[in-house]
């Protein structure tokens, strides 16, 4: 049995799968226009993909935008994510800028969760996790492989490593090259949940063929999935209304 993780008015826990919807836009006007459309869409949590924001390298502009987004989303929990280019993001930042951006967001009082990518300097990861927790912010630690699905043992190793580094919610997303790859991800999730997990997990197989992994989290052990209202942020994401319908049928 894993420990539940509560963020504002939602709880990540075994046997439940929450729906996260990405908020994407290059300009603040575009972002706010999209944000208003998400409030009534039925998402449990919103992820601002700040790597899509044209002014992401200007800290003051990011924080100003964040304040506007926080107001627009009302009570909805907010996940702050800068996705690096090597893991499927839109923009690249230096390591120094990446950690500074996330630290500022965590300390702002405007976000509820930040995303930290696993494949970074360990000392900087640990320091950022500590800063986030000191500010009352939860941490998703993530890894994304847009080219392949690693071996089951490797997926489990990465998720366990995230736990060891202090992640509240370990996350991995992988790309299948065959139906067997989808089964590999699901088997890794189930094994991790049953043998090693001390907290909720977030896992998915991407692309169209990986879609089954996005709707079976309650069965295999993924506590959050990603749906869309408009533009998707990763291949294989499903429109939120269809996603919830299928999840309800399967449950």
Curated annotation (Swiss-Prot):
The keyword Iron does not apply. This is 3-dehydroquinate dehydratase. NCBIfam families: aroD. Keywords: Amino-acid biosynthesis, Aromatic amino acid biosynthesis, Lyase, Schiff base. Involved in the third step of the chorismate pathway, which leads to the biosynthesis of aromatic amino acids. Catalyzes the cis-dehydration of 3-dehydroquinate (DHQ) and introduces the first double bond of the aromatic ring to yield 3-dehydroshikimate. InterPro entries: 3-dehydroquinate_DH_AS (IPR018508), Aldolase_TIM (IPR013785), DHquinase_I (IPR001381), Type-I_3-dehydroquinase (IPR050146). It comes from Klebsiella pneumoniae subsp. pneumoniae (strain ATCC 700721 / MGH 78578). It catalyses: 3-dehydroquinate = 3-dehydroshikimate + H2O. Coiled coil: none annotated. HAMAP family: AroD. Pathway: Metabolic intermediate biosynthesis; chorismate biosynthesis; chorismate from D-erythrose 4-phosphate and phosphoenolpyruvate: step 3/7. It is an enzyme of class 4 (lyase). Belongs to the type-I 3-dehydroquinase family. Its EC number is 4.2.1.10. Pfam families: DHquinase_I (PF01487). The keyword Repressor does not apply. GO terms for biological process: 3,4-dihydroxybenzoate biosynthetic process; amino acid biosynthetic process; aromatic amino acid family biosynthetic process; chorismate biosynthetic process. GO terms for molecular function: 3-dehydroquinate dehydratase activity. The active site is at 144 (proton donor/acceptor), 171 (schiff-base intermediate with substrate). The gene is aroD.
């Amino acid at each position: 049995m894993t420990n539940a993780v509560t963020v504002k008015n939602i709880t990540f826990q075994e046997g439940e799968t929450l729906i996260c919807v990405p908020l994407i836009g290059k300009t603040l006007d575009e972002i706010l226009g999209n944000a208003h459309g998400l409030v009534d869409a039925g998402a449990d949590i919103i992820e601002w993909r700040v790597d899509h924001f044209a002014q992401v390298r200007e800290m003051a502009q990011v924080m100003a935008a964040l304040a506007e987004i926080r107001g627009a989303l009302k009570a909805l929990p907010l996940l702050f994510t800068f996705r690096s280019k090597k893991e499927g993001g839109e923009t690249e930042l230096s390591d120094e800028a990446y950690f500074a951006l996330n630290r500022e967001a965590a300390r702002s009082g405007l976000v509820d969760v930040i995303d930290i990518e696993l494949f970074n300097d360990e000392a900087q990861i640990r320091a950022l996790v500590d800063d986030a927790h000191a500010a009352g912010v939860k941490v998703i630690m993530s890894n994304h492989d847009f080219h392949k699905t690693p071996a089951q043992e490797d997926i489990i190793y990465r998720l366990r490593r995230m736990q060891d580094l202090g992640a509240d919610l370990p996350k991995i997303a992988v790309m299948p090259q065959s139906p067997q790859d989808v089964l590999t991800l699901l088997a890794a999730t189930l094994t991790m949940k049953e043998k090693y997990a001390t907290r909720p997990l977030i896992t998915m197989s991407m692309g169209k063929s990986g879609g089954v992994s996005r709707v079976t989290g309650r069965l295999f052990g993924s506590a959050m999935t990603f749906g869309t209202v408009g533009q998707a942020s990763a291949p294989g994401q499903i429109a939120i209304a269809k996603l919830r319908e299928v999840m309800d049928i399967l449950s």
